[in-house]
Amino acid sequence: MWPLWLCWALWVLPLAGPGAALTEEQLLGSLLRQLQLSEVPVLDRADMEKLVIPAHVRAQYVVLLRRSHGDRSRGKRFSQSFREVAGRFLASEASTHLLVFGMEQRLPPNSELVQAVLRLFQEPVPKAALHRHGRLSPRSAQARVTVEWLRVRDDGSNRTSLIDSRLVSVHESGWKAFDVTEAVNFWQQLSRPRQPLLLQVSVQREHLGPLASGAHKLVRFASQGAPAGLGEPQLELHTLDLRDYGAQGDCDPEAPMTEGTRCCRQEMYIDLQGMKWAKNWVLEPPGFLAYECVGTCQQPPEALAFNWPFLGPRQCIASETASLPMIVSIKEGGRTRPQVVSLPNMRVQKCSCASDGALVPRRLQP
């Protein structure tokens, strides 16, 4: 079964490519969708000359303008290097385990997480226990193992987030791997000092009903009982050093662009006053800096690409964007009035090197 996060829809910018320049057609299309229009409205010049933008409309526009400079939509970047963190069972019940990992200083500075893998050792089931359950069909001999990130809020309440889920067979034993990249991404968003990383692992029956098997109770994750620490839960952290594999920030306006230019953010001005369709329709702003992502990204070593074959070549993309507030004129019932709208993901705030297929993390909710 593929990890859950591979099935999630990736966040897509309204750009032709990951870091491509915003076009006039894309800007117009976004504005029409926001206003739920099929075509550009026809507005009389005489009506526009009489139109006055009320103070409350302009105030709303200013508020959105300020907010757009603070709120950003985030994409996700890529990384390399390997680090292993040993964890421990904080609490265990028949079908639920609470794991704790001390994470402070485990992620190198100026690095980015590619993948975090939780490894748990599944103990072999004694033959006598299997015999008591009778002959199990392949379906009834499976259990669903679910991993959730557990966050303890400041008020003492708990919040869980689903991270990964997969089927395991009661007939198998050994190390099982779960993708917990998103849990570490959530943990990184916590304010300092951060609490340890808490992962809740639950084992449940896959099929419900009167004929469902109770074989899921046979699945246990614990120490092998071999040398000390051999069966402890392990958290593998794979990162890349952004000094080598990241973007460089804003482009140097003095330096010419070449094939070897490192990924950077380049200024690009969108002149709304020069667009025919915007005349008499878009009142504010007259234009804006949209920026675009240009340049190339260093590719990871072949060994890393082999470990994650689902990741494509790394590209220079817009990893953080901001909305664009506008004041437009709307005609309703023979009257023309101004209206404030906000177009999402119109201005590039940050460029990064990312691999096609890489995880796009969710924002941590309060």
Curated annotation (Swiss-Prot):
Listed GO biological process terms: anterior/posterior axis specification
GO cellular component: collagen-containing extracellular matrix; extracellular region; extracellular space; platelet alpha granule lumen
Classification via InterPro entries: Cystine-knot_cytokine, LRDF, TGF-b_C, TGF-b_propeptide, TGF-beta-rel, TGFb_CS
Source taxon at top rank: Eukaryota
Coiled-coil positions: none
Annotated signal sequence range: 1-21
Tissue: Mesenchymal cells of the endometrial stroma.
Glycosylation site residues: N158
Propeptide: 22-76
Database matches in Pfam families: TGF_beta, TGFb_propeptide
Compartments (UniProt record): Secreted
GO molecular function: cytokine activity; growth factor activity; transforming growth factor beta receptor binding
Similarity annotation: Belongs to the TGF-beta family.
Pathological association: Left-right axis malformations: The defect includes left pulmonary isomerism, with cardiac anomalies characterized by complete atrioventricular canal defect and hypoplastic left ventricle, and interrupted inferior vena cava.
Function, as annotated: Required for left-right (L-R) asymmetry determination of organ systems in mammals. May play a role in endometrial bleeding.
Name under which the protein is recorded: Left-right determination factor 2
Species lineage: Eukaryota, Metazoa, Chordata, Craniata, Vertebrata
Gene of this entry: LEFTY2
